[in-house]
């Protein structure tokens, strides 16, 4: 079973576009992880391995367009290839939802990105749902409920 510690989306310029922490850490520890990993991963060449060791855990990353998807995972328990597949499934799901997702979609619709992520990965870092179709169905239902709620507020 995969147990994620965190997920970061970082632009090629080193700006954090999204971050989600699945284990309890102090603000200092979180800042140190971001400060250490961002330049390390941005400096790596495209042909280098996507898996690196960092302190007490492993880091798996994958670049899609101008964004790096960085995941911290528990060592010896998790499968690095499964973690890469989780990243890929997350990107595919966003691609389907937004229609060819780009960095601007993530910036301006970050709440929807968090909704998709929360449908896929539970708050403890384990996989909740791997089916893209199911995740999209749940997010679409949430969208419908939100739009109905907003309509009722406007009309009342």
UniProtKB/Swiss-Prot annotation:
Coarsely, its chief localization is cytoplasm
Description of how the protein assembles with itself and partners: Adapter protein complex 1 (AP-1) is a heterotetramer composed of two large adaptins (gamma-type subunit APL4 and beta-type subunit APL2), a medium adaptin (mu-type subunit APM1) and a small adaptin (sigma-type subunit APS1). AP-1 interacts with clathrin. Also a component of the AP-1R complex composed of at least APM2, APL4 and APS1.
Q: Which GO terms describe its cellular component?
A: AP-1 adaptor complex; cytosol; endosome; intracellular membrane-bounded organelle; nucleus
Which keywords does this chain's UniProt record carry? Cytoplasm, Cytoplasmic vesicle, Endosome, Golgi apparatus, Membrane, Nucleus, Protein transport, Transport
Q: Specify the superkingdom.
A: Eukaryota
| Annotated function | Component of the adapter complexes which link clathrin to receptors in coated vesicles. Clathrin-associated protein complexes are believed to interact with the cytoplasmic tails of membrane proteins, leading to their selection and concentration. AP19 is probably a subunit of the Golgi membrane adapter. Component of the AP-1-related (AP-1R) complex, an adapter protein complex that mediates sorting of cargo SNARE SNC1. In contrast to the APM1-containing AP-1 complex, AP-1R is incapable of sorting CHS3.
Q: Which PROSITE patterns match?
A: CLAT_ADAPTOR_S
The protein's name in its UniProt record: AP-1 complex subunit sigma-1
Q: Which CDD domains match?
A: AP1_sigma
InterPro entries hit by this protein: AP1_sigma, AP_complex_ssu, AP_mu_sigma_su, Clathrin_sm-chain_CS, Longin-like_dom_sf
Q: Where are the transmembrane segments?
A: none
| Localization terms from the record | Cytoplasm; Nucleus; Cytoplasmic vesicle, Clathrin-coated vesicle membrane; Endosome
Q: Any miscellaneous information on file?
A: Present with 6370 molecules/cell in log phase SD medium.
- One GO MF term: clathrin adaptor activity
Does this entry carry the keyword Protein transport?
Answer: yes
Q: Which BP terms in the Gene Ontology apply to this protein? A: Golgi to vacuole transport; intracellular protein transport; vesicle targeting, trans-Golgi to endosome; vesicle-mediated transport
Protein family membership:
Belongs to the adaptor complexes small subunit family.
